[in-house]
UniProtKB/Swiss-Prot annotation:
Similarity remark: Belongs to the short-chain dehydrogenases/reductases (SDR) family. FolM subfamily.
GO terms of biological process kind: one-carbon metabolic process
Domain of life assignment: Bacteria
GO molecular function, one term: dihydrofolate reductase activity
Keyword check for Oxidoreductase: yes
Gene: folM
PROSITE patterns attached to this UniProt entry: ADH_SHORT
NCBIfam families referenced in this protein's UniProt entry, alphabetically: PRK06483.1 (NF005066)
Protein name: Dihydromonapterin reductase
Residues of the active site: Y152 (proton acceptor)
Family matches, as InterPro entries: NAD(P)-bd_dom_sf, Sc_DH/Rdtase_CS, SDR_fam
Reactions it catalyzes: (6S)-5,6,7,8-tetrahydrofolate + NADP(+) = 7,8-dihydrofolate + NADPH + H(+); 7,8-dihydromonapterin + NADPH + H(+) = 5,6,7,8-tetrahydromonapterin + NADP(+)
EC assignment: 1.5.1.50, 1.5.1.3
Length: 240
């Protein structure tokens, strides 16, 4: 890495949807990007060709998380930011042990960012006042709860709480914030009836797309003062 080259931004779960859009946003700005991915989608090849460093990671175990952190250290002496976007969505369902559901959700949404923030702390420090960032991607359900995804909601709530704890620990060098989205974009196979029902849950009645999140990420990275806060991107859904 050249002396004048910007420090890379690490995006976990950057192979699809919002993580992928954020990765492309930074690549288009000539900002170096490191992307973790679990499953090799065709989009990973596109990111690699555009200059991103894409690393397959297994966050299902603590050992896998720590092994990924060690790989990061071999590629860069510092990081501009860590965006914790890797996520899984698992409901309590008949036939699936509840302890497995809870363990899975806590592993990806709590253990993984907790261990990575500690393991990569040295790469975030030493660059100046408010010079680097951690952004946790949580969820709208942190505020409301969910009767069908109880473990998921609980794990995202824990991640939300860690935002404030890490903000206290890492200030003033590192800013730590959270983004709590609800519906941002649909899946290709979502039918018209589902889409309309989902849109009606917010005051704004629209799926804004990735740019709404990207603009917020840009704001948080450029701010020299904001830390320890969670930013809802929910179209007023909490008022319905």
């Amino acid at each position: 890495m050249g002396k004048n080259q910007p420090l890379p931004i690490l995006i976990t779960g950057g192979g699809r949807r919002i993580g992928l859009a954020i990765a492309w946003h930074f690549l288009n700005q000539k900002q170096p990007v490191i992307v973790s991915y679990r499953t090799h989608y065709p989009a990973i090849d596109g990111l690699t060709q555009a200059g991103a460093l894409c690393i397959q990671a297994d966050f299902s175990t603590d050992d896998g998380v720590l092994a990924f952190a060690e790989k990061i250290k071999t590629h860069t002496p510092g990081l501009r930011a860590i965006l914790h976007n890797a996520s899984a969505w698992m409901a309590e369902a008949p036939g699936t042990p509840l302890s497995d559901v809870l363990a899975c959700m806590m592993q990806i949404h709590v253990n993984t960012p907790y261990l990575l923030n500690h393991a990569l702390e040295r790469l975030l420090r030493g660059h100046g006042h408010a010079a680097t960032d951690i952004i946790h991607f949580t969820d709208y359900v942190v505020e409301r709860g969910s009767d069908k995804h109880i473990a998921y909601a609980a794990s995202k709530a824990a991640l939300d709480n860690m935002t404030r704890s890490f903000a206290r620990k890492l200030a003033p060098e590192v800013k730590v914030n959270a983004i709590a989205p609800s519906l941002i974009l649909f899946n290709e196979n979502d039918d018209a009836e589902y889409r309309q029902q989902a849109l009606n849950k917010s005051l704004m009645k629209t799926a804004p797309g990735e740019k709404e999140v990207i603009d917020l990420v840009d704001y948080l990275l450029t701010s020299c003062f904001v830390t320890g806060r969670s930013f809802a991107v929910d179209g007023g859904r909490h008022l319905r």
